[in-house]
């Protein structure tokens, strides 16, 4: 199994969608809406250089957006088959490395208030809760981590 993390290419787009959908699908019943990462334009994100993948076949996906003062972790997805194998940890470590490479002082992300597992994970990895916002049907917790 290849665990290098690399920029996604056009031929990865279907796998990016498949892994993202598999990682988030079970939340639909819990939160009552399709999670935002499942609605993303994966082809556009890949073309813009925002997507990084790991595995052959792909079993981990990151969508990263560099901003002026932080790196925004738009989404992180691990296939159900790869859960518990350290893929998520390696992806989060990569996010921090990428922020440092870009000279950005922190990583920011948000997660749905009903995604309890994610909240525990981010706190475990040193992210701090900054605020909670409600926009339409999305109730979100915002986190940051200084790197």
Give the positions of each predicted feature.
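Conserved glycine-rich acetyl-CoA-binding loop
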Residues: 79-93, 100-102, 113-120, 124
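Acetyl-CoA-dependent GNAT
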Residues: 3, 7-81, 92-94, 98, ...
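C-terminal "cap" of GNAT-fold acetyltransferases
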Residues: 50-52, 105-125, 131-147
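A generic secondary-structure micro-motif detector
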Residues: 31-32, 85, 108
């Amino acid at each position: 199994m290849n665990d290098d993390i690399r920029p996604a290419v056009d031929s990865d787009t279907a796998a990016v969608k498949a892994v993202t959908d598999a990682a988030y699908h079970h939340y639909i019943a819990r939160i009552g809406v399709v999670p935002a990462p499942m609605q993303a334009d994966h082809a556009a994100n890949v073309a813009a250089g925002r997507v990084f993948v790991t595995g052959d076949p792909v079993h981990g996906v990151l969508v990263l957006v560099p901003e002026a003062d932080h790196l925004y972790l738009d989404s992180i997805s691990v296939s159900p088959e790869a859960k518990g194998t350290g893929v998520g940890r390696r992806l989060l470590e990569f996010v921090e490395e990428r922020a440092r490479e870009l000279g950005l002082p922190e990583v920011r992300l948000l997660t749905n208030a009903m995604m309890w597992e994610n909240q525990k994970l981010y706190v475990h990895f040193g992210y701090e809760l900054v605020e909670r916002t409600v926009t339409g049907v999305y109730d979100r917790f915002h986190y940051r981590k200084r790197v």
